[in-house]
A protein has these predicted regions:
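Aromatic-rich, lipid-facing transmembrane alpha helices and their immediate juxtamembrane interface loops
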Residues: 1-325
Length: 325
């Protein structure tokens, strides 16, 4: 008989079920078509809350698998550390900029538990503005991307054996190595976005969300990209990004924005919208890439760091870079 393989049809069936069941459950919460929403009081009861199962169920399935059978003990530590960093970044986004960038008009789609948000225009806290579900998303979204990346990397598109990976980390002089080509590209894209905001169809306001994504979403990773790029399984990254896009097309483009679980303050956007997705702004689509990129890069930074077995300052900057005996 043929040896067991993760590519067996049972693995594919399990994957489809893990994504399909929460998708069916989420879609079942909707009782009205988007074009018929006018005058409908509650078209998607608890829809936002239930939709988080799109991330929760895959996270549970893949996390249990990874925790039971990690290829190396550093994977578990790196997964938790990277997920924590990305979740904190999401908390900062919502807590300090959620009032500036987002609206949450459909309270019936949530549990009704809301947290305060900072209003920069009035320099005060706005009580009961952010749905609790927002914070759950940032935790689950980070875990979803990293566990999916690990699944692709270890069981479908493997690049390294654990021993080879660990040996290669010892050749890294320091983690902080600025990627100047990436920084130059980042600068050009940032400038292009700001120019477009001023000469585009919606010049009023300020491209705050775009700037946030570019500065806090991409820029920090360029400090480490040269050091960890060789350790990233780029095929697995593509797989995890594709999985996130698939879920996001259902979660945000089909449901979240059309049913006003959340929406965007247009004066804080560039003005580029996808009309087929209820005017979804470009920044929302860019966030899908930011989440996937940050999660994978952060995971590999922590994984390389834990394998290096050096003191933090030595690992980051190469001072006394020899590994501990």
């Amino acid at each position: 008989s043929f040896p067991a393989s993760p590519r067996a049809p049972t693995a594919i069936v399990a994957m489809v079920a893990t994504l399909g069941f929460p998708a069916i459950l989420t879609l079942s919460r909707v009782s009205t078509r988007p074009e018929a929403l006018r005058g409908v009081e509650n078209p998607s009861p608890y829809g936002y809350t239930v939709s988080l199962s799109l991330f929760l169920l895959p996270v549970i399935v893949l996390s249990v698998f990874h925790m039971i059978r990690p290829r190396h003990h550093t994977h578990r530590r790196a997964l938790l550390a990277a997920s924590g960093v990305i979740a904190v970044l999401g908390f900062v986004l919502d807590t300090f900029f959620g009032h500036s960038f987002f609206t949450f008009r459909n309270e019936a789609a949530t549990l009704g538990i809301r947290l305060p948000a900072w209003d920069w225009s009035a320099l005060r806290w706005v009580p009961a503005y952010l749905p609790l579900e927002e914070f759950a998303f940032y935790i689950l979204g980070a875990l979803f991307v990293i566990t999916t990346y690990l699944w692709f990397s270890e069981y479908w598109l493997q690049d390294y054996e654990p021993q080879e990976y660990q040996a290669n980390t010892q050749t890294v002089g320091r983690l902080v190595q600025v990627s100047w080509p990436s920084l130059a590209l980042w600068t050009a894209l940032l400038a292009l976005g700001l120019v477009f905001k001023r000469i585009g169809p919606d010049p009023d306001g300020f491209a705050g969300y775009f700037i946030f994504l570019m500065v806090l979403g991409f820029l920090p990773t360029f400090l480490f990209l040269r050091a960890v790029a060789a350790f990233v399984n780029w095929r697995a990254f593509a797989g995890s990004y594709a999985a996130l896009m698939l879920v996001s097309l259902v979660w945000e483009a089909t449901l979240g924005v059309p049913y006003n679980w959340w929406n965007y303050k247009r004066d804080q956007m560039l003005g580029i919208e996808v009309q087929a997705w209820s005017g979804l702004p470009l920044e929302a689509v860019l966030l899908w890439l930011v989440i996937a990129w940050d999660c994978v890069i952060a995971f590999e930074i922590f994984r390389v760091f834990f394998h290096m077995d050096r003191k933090p300052m030595q690992a980051l900057f190469g001072h006394g870079a020899a590994a501990k005996e």
